[in-house]
């Protein structure tokens, strides 16, 4: 088995390429028809297995997905592929949690995070759609982030942030939050990026923790 080059994130060995899932779970970011085409192609457990098998045979043994979404067939395919090849696949979960500032919302968030741990996730990176609700650009902070990273640590996972907004990386580094890694959009076309390519490249280069780039191809 050929091994893809590796690095270390939060004390865990990861391949320098990750398995992405937008084009297996139905998020093309281009059109509704493209989304539907993807969902039709990957509508069974068996449909996922050749993709997982190919990656794993080349040493790419980590996959990123919002496993709280429409991904039950994918999870089953992951378990079957692990059994077939005798190698574990590292789960990088990006759940969407309720970040409202009240006791009920915190209970819901904790339950979602605990579900992620029960699924076997090693990393839990809050999805950008909820994490970015906490950003205060005026103060340069991510409000109440420590509440959620503690929940993640208490559940036995490694905390991180999924970001479309590059300020999440900057503010997290500046404030020393308990965050071991980031996700950030980066590609040479600027596709779905919120600020200039050069600015994001500089932010990634100077980040204090490893950055997993998405939508690169």
What are these regions (language model features)?
Residues 1-83:
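N-terminal binding-site loop/beta-alpha segment at the start of enzyme catalytic domains
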Residues 36-56, 102-117, 164-171:
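Short, acidic/polar
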Residues 64-65, 93, 126, 160-162:
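General beta-strand structural signal in soluble alpha/beta enzymes
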Residues 53-57, 75-88, 110-121, 173-176, ...:
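Acidic (Asp/Glu)-rich catalytic clusters
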Residues 97-107, 122, 129-217:
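Beta/alpha (TIM)-barrel catalytic core signal, keyed to glycine-rich beta->alpha loops juxtaposed to Asp/Glu
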Residues 14-17, 59-62, 83-91, 120-122, ...:
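Short, well-ordered coil/turn segments that N-cap beta-strands
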Residues 68-69, 87-105:
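Structural motif corresponding to the early beta-alpha repeats
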């Amino acid at each position: 088995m050929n091994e893809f080059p590796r690095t270390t994130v939060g004390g865990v060995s990861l391949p320098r390429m990750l398995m992405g899932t937008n084009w297996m779970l139905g998020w093309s970011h281009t059109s509704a028809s493209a989304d539907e085409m993807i969902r039709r192609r990957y509508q069974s457990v068996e449909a996922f297995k050749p993709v997982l098998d190919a990656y794993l045979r080349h040493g790419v043994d980590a996959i990123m997905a919002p496993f709280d979404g429409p991904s039950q067939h994918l999870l089953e395919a992951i378990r079957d592929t692990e059994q077939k090849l005798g190698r574990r696949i590292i789960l990088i979960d990006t759940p969407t949690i309720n970040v409202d500032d009240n006791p009920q919302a915190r209970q819901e968030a904790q339950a979602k995070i605990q579900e992620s741990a029960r699924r076997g996730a090693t990393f839990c990176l809050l999805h950008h759609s909820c994490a970015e609700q906490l950003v205060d650009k005026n103060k340069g902070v991510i409000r109440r982030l420590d509440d959620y990273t503690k929940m993640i640590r208490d559940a036995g996972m490694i905390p991180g942030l999924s970001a479309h907004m590059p300020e999440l990386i900057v503010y997290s580094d500046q404030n020393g939050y308990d965050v071991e890694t980031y996700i950030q959009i980066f590609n040479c076309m600027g596709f779905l990026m919120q600020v200039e390519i050069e600015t994001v490249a500089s932010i990634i280069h100077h980040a204090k923790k490893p950055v997993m780039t998405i939508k690169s191809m």
